[in-house]
């Protein structure tokens, strides 16, 4: 598995993930990029789960974003509909965390689309550790979204054996209206 964490704070949304890929109890790769930019760099996304499955989902989600003119929530719902009804997709074992200027969402393997409380997402085997640390940092510090993601990934990596200390982090600056 892995750890993906997303935080939205002070006109920034950030998604970060570790770089470890395991096969059974063996580390196969330590610098995988599980977070990427999509749709003309307006959407950031991270995955937890099977690597091949996740790349398939990235491609499918990017196609949905294009079809839905970059509307994140609409694309996520359309993706979830396909995930629920397509036999091949139902066999894919992965979760996606996606965000743009307006929303942060989790797309599950069951075809659910979840907008979490406080725009905090943490998925994967290290997700509970990252979520707890990010929540504590959000509530008790003035750290930036990026700093919270970095520290949460470090904490998760110190606890979860399926999470390492080689993160990929992507950030979007949210344009304020006015």
Swiss-Prot record:
Similarity-based family: Belongs to the peptidase T1B family. HslV subfamily.
EC supergroup of this enzyme: hydrolase
Assembly with partners or alone: A double ring-shaped homohexamer of HslV is capped on each side by a ring-shaped HslU homohexamer. The assembly of the HslU/HslV complex is dependent on binding of ATP.
Keyword Calcium: no
Highest taxon in the source lineage: Bacteria
GO terms under cellular component: HslUV protease complex; proteasome core complex
Protein name: ATP-dependent protease subunit HslV
Gene Ontology terms for molecular function: metal ion binding; threonine-type endopeptidase activity
Active site: 2
Gene expressing this chain: hslV
Family annotation (NCBIfam families): ATP_dep_HslV, PRK05456.1
Broad class of the protein's primary localization: cytoplasm
Species this chain originates from: Hamiltonella defensa subsp. Acyrthosiphon pisum (strain 5AT)
Location(s), subcellular: Cytoplasm
Activity regulation info: Allosterically activated by HslU binding.
UniProt xrefs under InterPro entries: ATP-dep_Prtase_HsIV_su, Ntn_hydrolases_N, Proteasome_sua/b, Proteasome_suB-type
Database matches in SUPFAM superfamilies: N-terminal nucleophile aminohydrolases (Ntn hydrolases)
The enzyme's E.C. designation: 3.4.25.2
Reaction catalysed by this enzyme: ATP-dependent cleavage of peptide bonds with broad specificity
Pfam families hit by this protein: Proteasome
GO process annotations (BP): proteolysis involved in protein catabolic process
Keywords: Allosteric enzyme, Cytoplasm, Hydrolase, Metal-binding, Protease, Sodium, Threonine protease
Binding site for Na(+): 157, 160, 163
Protein role: Protease subunit of a proteasome-like degradation complex believed to be a general protein degrading machinery.
């Amino acid at each position: 598995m892995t750890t993906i964490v997303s935080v939205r704070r002070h006109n920034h949304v950030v998604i970060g993930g570790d770089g470890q890929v395991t096969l059974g109890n063996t580390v196969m790769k330590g610098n995988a990029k599980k977070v990427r930019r999509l749709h003309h760099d307006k959407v950031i996304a991270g995955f937890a789960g099977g690597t091949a499955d996740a790349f398939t989902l990235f491609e499918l989600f990017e196609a949905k974003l294009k079809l839905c003119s970059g509307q994140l929530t609409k694309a996520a719902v359309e993706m979830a509909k396909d995930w629920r009804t397509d036999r091949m997709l139902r066999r894919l074992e992965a979760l996606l965390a996606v965000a743009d200027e307006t929303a942060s969402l989790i797309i599950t393997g069951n075809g659910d689309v979840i907008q979490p409380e406080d725009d905090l997402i943490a998925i994967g085997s290290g997700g509970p550790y990252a979520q707890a640390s990010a929540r504590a940092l959000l509530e008790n510090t003035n750290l930036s979204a990026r700093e919270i993601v970095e520290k949460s990934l470090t904490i998760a990596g110190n606890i979860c054996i399926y999470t390492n200390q080689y993160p990929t982090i992507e950030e979007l600056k949210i344009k304020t209206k006015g």
